[in-house]
Regions:
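Aromatic- and charge-enriched surface segment that lines or borders ligand/interaction sites
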Residues: 89-134, 155, 161-163, 253-256, ...
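Surface-exposed binding/hinge segments that line
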Residues: 102, 139-192
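Short, well-ordered beta-strand elements
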Residues: 34-44, 88, 98-100, 120-124, ...
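Ligand-site clamp/hinge motif
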Residues: 202, 229-275, 391, 400-402
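N-terminal lobe/hinge region of extracytoplasmic solute-binding protein
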Residues: 41-94, 125, 207-213
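Alpha-helical secondary-structure segments
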Residues: 39, 116-125, 157-163, 167, ...
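Gly/Pro-rich hinge or "lid" segments in bacterial periplasmic/extracellular proteins
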Residues: 76, 178-237, 355-356, 360
């Protein structure tokens, strides 16, 4: 979220590879994992399948990113650019709808089967035809069951053609094709395992069919995931084995890290992170994530529909105080709808707690003494704690905020039905393209109850024909520079006038043992890479 690409590149270089923020040499003997093995404590309870055409959770996406290849991957140092994965080169036709990819030579799957253009085309066709959750990502470029066989096809053994339903920004198309639903699977292997026309989905739930740097050795549900280096991979890999262990308790992760039983801990509390950095048992690296925590104000509530009230609420949050005392280092203040690391991100946080200014705005809105309103709150950290702090902030201007607790399913269902007053929750991007968030916060083509497009603006009944037009225009803009400028203009508009109080951006903090380097943690789990790991 920087105004210049040079400063953005500097930030993302720091983000993409975990480096030490704080470290002191260890002063006592400790156990250690083998030199060529990397052991990490994390949360594995989201796993229900290993099929990239079915996975739609965070850590499973990370697994897919390291076991499978795709055509391209976004360049984290400059999100307007892309690096070839199995694609050696690519081009776009004059109409802007035909994308031709030329593949590298001598690619092979873990099975030993040759990886050809037919595998690439079949993998994308398979994901669309299975029609699981990830198919929605590919639908973003117009691929559906009716057209995917025609629009995704091999031209020869080394060339694939993908045609979109209309002209999109090339950066958008490449972001979609560089995401996990477009992972390349071993067609020959999966057809041999196919049952009842399932494209091998039943078998792939517990096996793998990839060509990435690591292959699956063993998955024990709720316990561990073991990966082995693929010695036929095109790039050198230092780590022979990667072990992910399910350790739900932060305190246990800390003890394992301090004792040398693991090389990295992904889920330590802020206090634990500070402690292990101070005592020299670990190095802590922070990586901004593409997850925004925000308030949604339902404009069906006539009071919340008033622009002065919406602005007043933005001045009635003690952002810095909540960060300092509640979320600490796990979130940071962020008030625009594009997270750090996205094309066109805008670094602007103008709002702070200003009760006098908020009261003046409420008076202009006709509610000088405040009003009563409810907030649906997920009964989990940090949502409850943040909501309670905001409740106290609002009270300073006479606003009586009643908190309605519920589990995530309950609060989200009410939000999606537009039955809330205020909703506190988060929004995570599926892929690192600005449209992923602009579509949520600044796009509402049909505000009716029967709309087929029920994104965040719709959920808050915010009718925005002009912003919707701008979002559609940015989606089709071929120039990355002009596209970035369009998203910056939209962010300024939403920041100034919208029913969204965007509060914080999530920050992933990884604690690694001294001597560990190269764990690349991007803004989404799909961009976590083990390729450069060293000890």
């Amino acid at each position: 979220m920087k105004p210049s690409m040079s400063s953005l590149a500097a930030l993302l270089a720091a983000v993409s590879t975990c480096f030490a923020l704080a470290a002191v040499p260890a002063v006592e003997a400790r156990a250690a994992t083998p030199k060529d093995m990397f052991v990490m404590a994390t949360l594995l309870d989201e796993f229900s399948t290993l099929d990239p055409a079915e996975v739609y959770e965070l850590v499973p996406e990370e697994y897919i990113a390291n076991v499978y290849d795709r055509l391209v991957r976004v360049n984290l140092a400059d999100p307007s650019k892309f690096d070839g994965d199995i694609a050696q080169s690519w081009s776009v036709d004059a109409e802007g709808t035909g994308f031709t990819f030329r593949m590298r030579d001598d690619l092979r799957f873990h099975s030993g089967n040759a990886l050809t253009a037919e595998d690439v085309a079949w993998s994308i066709q398979r994901a669309v035809l299975l029609d699981k959750g990830p198919a929605a990502v590919l639908a973003g470029i117009g691929l559906n069951k009716a057209n995917v066989m025609q629009n995704v096809r091999k031209l020869d053994d080394h060339t694939v053609m993908i045609r979109t339903d209309r002209k999109y920004a090339p950066t958008f198309v490449l972001n979609v094709l560089g995401s996990w639903p477009a992972s390349v699977v071993d067609r020959t292997l999966l057809l041999a395992q196919q049952q009842n026309g399932d494209y091998g989905n039943g078998w792939l739930k517990t096996h793998e069919a990839g060509s990435g740097g690591y292959r699956l050795v063993k998955w024990t549900a709720g316990d561990s995931l073991v990966l082995q280096r693929f010695d036929g991979y095109r790039l050198p890999l230092a780590m022979k084995r990667i072990v992910l262990r399910h350790v739900p308790e932060a305190a246990t992760q800390r003890l394992m890290l301090e004792s040398g039983d693991i090389d990295a801990a992904r889920d330590l509390s802020p206090d634990d992170l500070a402690a292990v950095a101070k005592n020299g048992k670990a190095r802590v690296a922070a990586s901004p994530q593409a997850t925004l925590l925000y308030l949604g104000l339902n404009t069906r509530n006539p009071t919340l529909a008033r622009p002065q009230v919406q602005e007043a609420l933005k001045w009635l949050v003690d952002y810095q105080g909540i960060q300092r005392n509640v979320v600490k280092t796990t979130y940071r203040v962020h008030q625009t709808f594009l997270p750090d690391g996205f094309l066109g991100t805008l670094d602007s946080n103008p709002y702070h707690l200003d009760v006098a200014r908020a009261k003046a705005l409420l008076a202009k809105a006709g509610v000088p003494n405040g009003f009563a309103v409810t907030m649906d709150v997920r009964n989990d950290y940090p949502y409850t704690e943040i909501a309670q702090a905001i409740q106290a902030n609002f009270a300073q201007a006479g606003i009586k905020l009643t908190l309605i607790p519920g589990d995530n399913k309950q609060t989200l269902a009410k939000y999606r039905a537009r039955q809330h007053d205020i909703y506190i929750g988060d929004w995570s991007a599926d892929y690192i393209d600005p449209h992923s968030n602009a579509q949520g916060f600044a796009w509402n083509p049909d505000n009716s109850d029967n709309s087929s497009f029920k994104m965040l603006a719709w959920r808050n009944a915010w009718n925005i024909p002009e912003l919707t037009r701008q979002t559609d225009a940015a989606l089709a803009e071929p120039s990355p520079t002009r596209r970035a400028q369009q998203y910056q203009a939209m962010q300024k508009a939403v920041l100034a006038n919208s029913p969204f109080v965007i509060l914080f951006e999530k920050v992933a903090q990884v604690a690694t043992a001294p001597g560990v380097s190269g764990l690349a943690v991007g803004p989404i789990n799909d961009l976590v890479s083990y390729r450069q790991l060293k000890k």
